[in-house]
A protein has these predicted regions:
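Active-site-adjacent betaalpha module
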Residues: 1-12, 44-52, 69, 76-199
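N-terminal nucleotide-binding beta1-loop-alpha1 segment
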Residues: 12-18
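Short, conserved beta-strand edge motifs with alternating hydrophobic and charged residues
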Residues: 15, 57-60, 108-110
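Catalytic metal-binding/acid-base residues of hydrolase active sites
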Residues: 19, 62-63, 140, 166
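Short acidic, Gly/Ser-rich segments with clustered Asp/Glu that frequently serve as metal-coordination loops
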Residues: 19-25
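Short glycine-enriched, charge-decorated loop/helix-capping segments at active-site entrances
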Residues: 27-34
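Short amphipathic alpha-helical segment that frequently serves as the phosphate-/nucleotide-binding helix
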Residues: 35-43
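Short beta-strand segments at enzyme active-site cores
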Residues: 54-61, 66, 162
Length: 199
């Protein structure tokens, strides 16, 4: 399945919210990301996509300094308003070492909201580049990655998730969400299988 998708459709790698502030705000997320070794794995995937001339897209959250467009309608939004985390231009909002955007990469950022298709140019950007398959990596397997996967399927993309390139705050919850939720809408695979399928 993955070989057919990556061999017959144009794919893009989407690196979601791999930012310093996420791991500062949520230490358990940082610990899981480190334990699972997702940063070097994502870096390898990104290098493979770039080598094939395929798009690498970063989807960070970078809040406006006055936080005016962050509505207190969820626990995460309330936490952002309380901590003033991930403000554009601050260290919190910057990318983790090794996953900074390269000159030919794309960045589709948002200042509020839960997932990267909402309130951004991501869908239009993908359409204009002729992308049909999206490969999702980054954080978190609890919220951001499922949100991207559901929206991606609704927008008629094929969705691939290398499970060893995503992380959440708890491994047990991660496993349940991958098995009971993500696999229903996405092809679950590994970094090595994606690289092999790229050829």
């Amino acid at each position: 399945m993955i070989e057919k998708l990556l061999g017959s459709t144009k794919a893009a790698l989407i690196i979601n919210e791999m930012q310093l502030g996420n791991f500062k705000m949520f230490p358990a997320l940082g610990a899981e990301a480190e334990r699972r070794g997702i940063v070097p794995k994502i870096a390898q995937l990104a290098a493979a996509f770039r080598a094939k001339g395929l798009p690498v897209i970063h989807t960070p959250t970078m809040h406006h300094p006055n936080l005016a467009d962050v509505k207190r309608n969820s626990m995460i939004a309330s936490f952002v308003l309380k901590t003033r985390a991930m403000i554009k231009g601050t260290e919190d909002a910057w990318y983790v070492e090794g996953l900074e955007p390269e000159p030919d990469d794309h960045v589709s950022q948002r200042s509020s909201g839960i997932f990267a298709f909402q309130g951004t140019d991501l869908n239009v950007r993908l359409r204009r580049m002729g992308v049909e398959t999206i490969v999702l990596v980054g954080v978190s397997s609890t919220l951001g990655i499922p949100g991207l996967a559901f929206a991606g399927v609704d927008f008629a993309y094929h969705v691939i998730v290398p499970e060893d390139c995503i992380a959440g705050t708890d491994q047990k919850v991660h496993e349940i969400l991958v098995q009971e939720q993500l696999r229903i809408v996405a092809t679950i695979t590994t970094k090595d299988e994606v690289i092999a399928a790229l050829g």
